[in-house]
Amino acid sequence: MFSCDVLQPPIAKNCVLLKTLQRVQSNRITRVIRISFKEHPDYNLDFFEKKSYALKVKKILLIWMLMCLCFSCKTPPNVTVTKINYADFYGLVQSHSASSTQLQNSDTTEEQSADEPAEIGYVSVQLDAEIFEPKNEKYYDAILPNNMFSFLAYKNHCEIFFDASDITSFIFYINETKVDSSEICANGFSKIDASAIVKNGRNILYVSNIEKSSQSAALKIRIPYPILTRTNKKIPDVNYKALQLVDELLQSQVANGFPSVQLLVAKDGFIVADHSYGKIYNVDKFSDSGLSDAANVTGKTLYDLASNTKMYATVFAIQRLVFEKKISIHDKISKFFPEFSDEKKARRTGKSEMTIEHLLTHSSGFPAGAAYYAKKIVKNANGKDRKEKVLKEILKTKLINNVGSKVVYSDINFMLLSFIVEKVTGQTFDSFVEDKIYTPLSLKRICFKPLEHGFPLSEIAATEIGLNRSKRNETNNYFVHGHVHDPEAYNSMNEVSGHAGLFGNAESLAVLAQTMINGGGYGNTRIFSETITRNFLGVSQYHPAYALGWRMQNTDAYKWNFSTLASPQTFGHTGWTGTMSLFDVENNLIIIILTNAKHSAYTGGNQFEGDYFLTRNYGAITSIIYSAFSDYDSEYLATLLTELASQKFALINASPRFQNNGAYNDLAAIMQVLQKHSHSSTVKKFLKSEAAMQINNLLRKNSK
């Protein structure tokens, strides 16, 4: 019926509606409203006397006026400029290196740790830009890309450093927001807090119209990598009811017999959950009784990471060596070990063509394992000689598939990769990852052989119960505690291997995961480049669920672990002892779940009671965590909870494998959480159902 246009020409002055809304002042522009009735045959002022139309027009004009007022009153961006000195800009390691701040606390100005700075070779930032002029050979003839830069940032913490010495003025934008540069120019060396104007994820910085007071002047900009931030404040857009439900489930599972859990969740650079449950062990070595004086698990407790070693030691080491240009993923294994070749009359061949990429993607043709520790030649050897014997045995191992023809998950691949690292660097594998990865990132609670690093048993979670083994006067006769559980790593590789042996806490893995999201760096420390990160996180040509070493979601291939809600760009791994890590690059999300699920009663095969709890099977917990970052209501969460109970009951009825105390106790834990949510109409209805009655009967029967 009508259209509202913003224009300057005068219109009827006696229009009743327009007398009160004739002019709106916004950003020094006088705007006048003209109402044109395009479809009405009589274009005159009498039309406004029709009350119903007048009211509609008045409402629209009022809404328009309020919108204009909102835009005109927009608060300028809150950008704090701080004067710094030459050393602060060119030696950022003094105050902003990851080496001096592993985790930032956004509620205070204090750093959490103040360790020694990293070696100078590691000091690097994600953006180190100098604005060139056309006469410079580095200037792009496309023009605009010279002054536009992409960087990763989060709303909680983003600092940008400037060397504007002898710069009198310049135009400066972050995304669509223009920032006043006058104070930056006045200071010479400055840093700005851009937390209020950056967005979570990729941002664009644009500078232009640089005015200099000397010909030699050049505007320089540096931006550190994002770091993880702790806060006591609630983060917007986080459904804390979902995180509370996870907390209730984990507490209930531990109360019903699950050994222990360490959980860390980080979203957009904020740590939104960091909890620990249970004790480091729950049986006495001599009496089989529970121990009330066993140390509680804390955020500092170390867990046997099992196959997460492959990611956070071996893959990191290979990525670092590729960054240093000491190796290529296309290097053949025979380059490092010339004796590595097909044996005569081999049924499966290709050793001479096998590359590092084949090892990373489990397409080498090696079997899953070979129990080298059981071979007499290995058992009779000691120390360094034992590892040399193992290497010879690996190089002689027969292939079960032609190289590159099939993917078979194999520990041998990563054992061999650790030998390659040692061959190339001249260091032991554990010392290399400590020197080149963990120390530069100030990670003090991740290592091989934790007892030798001075960690007491009270800070390490125990693993398998009832494993009878002893070596070098070590006491592991009742349960494994402080030593790697994996028999190959323990007996063949002196507890240091590329496939198992690493111990760490959730916080350390979260920092390493954030390093991957960041593109290879953390704070002011670069471990490898963004190009290498992208290459290693690309889909393997051999299997859609593999990148280079990393497991990936891709086409929901890993949803049992990561959850269906995870983006295709989600990566991570699991460990046999009960550990899981994931980082979702698209959603800037990190989830670390560390458990000692094997520290429970044996049920047969490779299974223990702890393996039958939801916590150990990951996907249910990760699904609820993902829902914390979507706008799901309470009844949705209640529905998830009832689904967990009904389908766990169905699994128990469907398979004898699930008819054990682990599964029963898990179901009991779920039902106890349901009782806490009995105020929900969905839960209330379920608790009155026939299914709930059958579940309670089953639990009563098996509690006797």
Where are these regions (language model features)?
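Beta-strand-rich recognition domains
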Residues: 78-174, 196-240, 244, 249
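C-terminal motif of bacterial Sec signal peptides marking the signal peptidase cleavage site
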Residues: 71-72
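Active-site SXXK
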Residues: 244-250, 263, 269, 301-330, ...
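Short, gly/Ser/Thr-rich active-site loops of penicillin-recognizing serine hydrolases
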Residues: 234-239, 288, 518, 531-535, ...
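Short, conserved catalytic-motif segment at the N-terminal edge
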Residues: 236-303, 326, 343, 602-607, ...
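Short strand-turn-strand beta-turns centered on an Asx-Gly dipeptide
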Residues: 172-180, 268-269
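N-terminal amphipathic/hydrophobic targeting modules at extreme N-termini
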Residues: 6, 29-45, 51
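Short, surface-exposed loop or secondary-structure junction motifs
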Residues: 270, 281, 344-569
